[in-house]
Amino acid sequence: MSGVNVADLLATTMTLPITAAAGAATSQAAATSATNASHLQPATLTGHISTTAAAKTTTTPTSSLPITSQFVDASLTSLSLTATSSDASYSSPFSSYLSSDSTFELLSTVGPNITANGSDIAVDNQAELEESWLDLSLLLLKGFIFSSIILAAVLGNALVIISVQRNRKLRVITNYFVVSLAMADMLVALCAMTFNASVELSGGKWMFGPFMCNVYNSLDVYFSTASILHLCCISVDRYYAIVRPLEYPLNMTHKTVCFMLANVWILPALISFTPIFLGWYTTEEHLREISLHPDQCSFVVNKAYALISSSVSFWIPGIVMLVMYWRIFKEAIRQRKALSRTSSNILLNSVHMGHTQQPTSLSYLHPSDCDLNATSAREETHSALSNLEDMLQPATDEDDDRDECDELRVPSPPPRRLSRSSIDLRDLEQERYEKVTHTDSAPSMMALQQQQPSHNQLQPPAPVFNPQIWTEGKMIPSKELDKEHSHPNGPQQQLSLTSGSGNSEPEPESTAYRVFGGLNSDESEGNDLYDTHLPLAEDNKELKRLIEDNYLYFKRQTGGTIISGPGGGKYAALSETDFIRLKAGAAACGRKAFASSDSEFLRTISESRALPEQPVPGKEKGFNILSLLSKTKRSSTECFTLEKKRHQANSEGSSFFRRSRNRKLSHSYNGCGGGKERKLERRQRQHSDTDSTPNKPDILLDINVLSEQSGASVIQQFSDGVQLIDFSELKTPPERIRSDDELAQLADCFGESPQQPATPPPSLSPPELPEPSGLLIASSSELAEIFRSLSFPLGRPAGAPQRLSTLSDQVCANYLMSPPNTPAPPAISVPNGGAMDSSASSNAQSASINVYFLSPPPHAAAPGYTPSDTSTVSLDVVTSLPMPVPVPQPNPQMASQSNISPKPEIILDSTLSPVEGCGDEHRDVTSPLFKRKDSAGDADVSVSGNGGAGGVGGVGGRQGRCSILAGYDGIQTVRKRQASVVTYDVNVINFSQENSDSRSYIPMGRVSTSSAKHEFSNKSSLIRRGGICIFVDEEEAEIIEQRPRGITFAAVPSPLPKCPLCGADISSTTGTTANATATANADSTIDTTVTTSSKRSIHEQTPDLGQRPASSSSSTRFWHKRTAAVTACWQQSKNRKRRFKTGCSHCGATGGSVRPAKGWKAEHKAARTLGIIMGVFLLCWLPFFLWYVITSLCGPACPCPDVLVVVLFWIGYFNSTLNPLIYAYFNRDFREAFRNTLECVLPCLEKRNPYNAYYV
């Protein structure tokens, strides 16, 4: 019975099912059986105890080893106590043996097993702890990735919707699909990604029930399919917009777009909600498994649903998108090729027409030049004359010189088209313009000039002479040759023959022309002497023979007055009709042939031989009449009208018109010619103002260069030119008019003369000025009166001359035709004529105050004021003249107050530039002409910002908000027109005084409220009728300027050529500096002048603060230098990468094409953006749908890891996040809209701009 008690004790203490011990105790077997049972029972118990203990310890890994040992020791103690206190009535041999031996055997067996199990438990606990930390890290990482994708998708697509709603520019039909796509992507993130993330983060358990499992699967399929169908609709929209643009407005209407969007949102419901809730999508086994395990939400589909849903959701829309974008890509490539071919042909045709300059029909322009049919004659001379343009190329490698060196031309065949694709409206316009500008003479011949031989004049080639012409040419009287050389130093005369527009007879004597003021008669282009006479090619003997015959024939007709000097002579080519007459024997028919030229003819050849020109008294100080009336920006239509009026032989009155020597109007008015420096300056000034087109004729360049030259050089340079004026109503011969007193008075108006008008002429106020096109001068007295009234006579010849030019920004508001096309060069203010030393006088000779003037101010008669011989009046823009007020002793601090405006109504440009004061000299610091090669300028100019009202923005005095206005007092700077990237519309500020009877003068300039001038606050008499007021937050400007910006350089004009499209520098073998690139950026809206002044003012005020310790300032300078060095290294590496990339980095133009190389339209750019979206869509969803179809068709035969399935799902979801990022990166309109929206929604992202402009 003891065995039964031991079994009961073990069952209650150890909870072990010891069934073998109970069976052995209840059996009443024999002694042998009992003995065997007693030997087997302890071993069985020991095995059960050990295994049970091990199982117990392994099933409770959190329990510690001492607790387990104590529990076993207590069990063993109770076990021994029970064994020893058994009942005596049950004493037997079996019980006595069990009580004595089994207890010690049990203890000896359990002890070693417990020690071994304790070591195994410690190792298992450490390994499981490491696995738990790894699982927790993976869980946190997955949660971060899932939440980031979801937030980016929701916020990005919401930003797309808000931006389109706020920006009216984005409200186009295509963006309707974009907004709908953004809505679908945002719902994918909210309804599909969130449920999937919860399942993955919870270990695969579904916590929302079976119904929500179906909802989740339906929403996932629905929104994903809707997003893909939106991309398909966008591709169709782009296809019609680019490939079929004519059908696009008819097909893509609002009704069509609404119908497409309705299908996009309805069709996915047919493959998502309906089959999933009805149970059509899966198998019966999967439905039973879902009912048995509601905590599982797996999406298992059958083969039919897999094929249908994948086709509707991905395969069909993907194929449609591929086809559409392939067609779009092919069309875009075709258009780009056509665009490139057209641009190349336009360039070639422009060069071709620039050399030929030949209208298409000579008989149309001049139907009566010759009476014989020229068709056969043209065919005979075509072989010799068609290649002249190849023979007359200039001896330079630059392409810019080719279009200018077209002075000596013989007619060539009409320019032919190089390809069919080159037909362009600009070609037709160019051809029409060439017809208009060369109506005077179709061949555009060069008039023969008698000049002194120079070192590079043409050498007479070895000719093949016509014997008859050569014999007649040798019979030239020697007295005429001596008569020709009798006046070597006098002004040279332009000799030519005349041909009327109606017939080929000479014009009558009454319509002869006379010479006036030959000083500057050639439109400031006398300096291109060496550019206009080209060397003849030596490789075409036939061409040389024709030119030599032409020269000798013309020499014979003019009586042999033109000879070849020691250095060679200049040859004038006749027109094509004269060549025809020469070959047809025109000399025998009794008709005198005339050579047509572009300039007006002075007189017949006989008169020119009989009456050589005498020097005009006072001609050294003559005045260019063309700078008064002919230097206006006329369009081609106006020029054509003027030339037609000139050719009409009627009595409408006299008029005069002049053109440059065989130059196009665009070349003449843009100042072409004069060397490479002039062309470089023209490129730099071409895009200074955005209020005019780059190719608009500009008359100010030639005048400005002319005004900066000394009088002696001008006389020497332009002594060969003549000025042509038509005095048809005069009955006196031309030589008598030249010696008349009126002409002397006319010349004295611009020379040294004591005559001064005390007051401005009342008849020439700005509204009463005559129109440039309708100005008629009947006599020289009227012309002299106009000149005298529009000029400033000398007041004191001994004083320093006050140079005047025709560039200014101070424009009269009541007579404004168009603003100047070029920026203002540096201005120099000469305070006093008597108080000026020789160095200041020399500086005044080299620079100029660039102003327009209409009438002299009251202080114009002050001593020291002297107009130069190049003073001009432009009828295009008339402005007021700020003149210095005479001060006995000039004060450098108050020198800038002398600039005042004599007009109460002014127009101020919105681009403001500071003026540097260095002694008596004032310069425009930021003007691009400050660094001109022909003007002296310093490399570094510092602008002081403290004291008075100095400094832009008034960074001197007290901190706060100050305004930049124009007032009466406190003038420290002068408004100058400058070239800047910050250009607005013309801002008009009109000032007037109440109860003012007499003309008052209001000074111009910037006045700061933080200045020491307290009387500026009294503006009771100031009436502002409208203008721009610029406010500067000085504290914010100081914060911005204190930020380290690296190395900054002074703005210097770039030597690189300018892009004809955007005005930026065209990069060559080396890159430009970072400052030049930043300056050319048109998106920078901060005024550079204000920035420069604020920066320099802050740098000047920093040493005065004295609040920083020496260590802090030294460390700041150290890090500033380090930052500057890193910036410079980065810029050098960037330039090194762009070393071999030529062309404009802004618009893509390479310098030769008229259009940009990357000139896609807006539709092409939208197609490119959406094409990138389509590519990203394919990369994201294609792997998922491949897995989806393969696993659905194969079933259990194609197993796939769960991790791969999760990765494929979230790659597809990531497509919804990438779409807004693609919009922001590739589409500039969306990028700007995103920036504006973020600045409005999030105030912390708003840029703090201290410069604000308000319209008052």
UniProtKB/Swiss-Prot annotation:
Gene name of the encoded protein: Octbeta3R
Assigned keywords, A-Z: Cell membrane, G-protein coupled receptor, Glycoprotein, Membrane, Receptor, Transducer, Transmembrane, Transmembrane helix
Signal peptide range: none
Membrane spanning stretches: 144-164, 172-192, 214-236, 259-279, 306-326, 1170-1190, 1203-1223
Disulfide bond entries: none
Family: Belongs to the G-protein coupled receptor 1 family.
Glycosylated residues (UniProt): 36, 113, 117, 196
Compositional bias (Pro residues): 757-770
GO MF terms, alphabetically ordered: G protein-coupled amine receptor activity; octopamine receptor activity
Residue spans, topological domain Extracellular: 1-143, 193-213, 280-305, 1191-1202
Subcellular location: Cell membrane
Protein name: Octopamine receptor beta-3R
Membrane side Cytoplasmic: residue ranges: 165-171, 237-258, 327-1169, 1224-1256
GO biological process, one term: G protein-coupled receptor signaling pathway
Stored PROSITE patterns: G_PROTEIN_RECEP_F1_1, G_PROTEIN_RECEP_F1_2
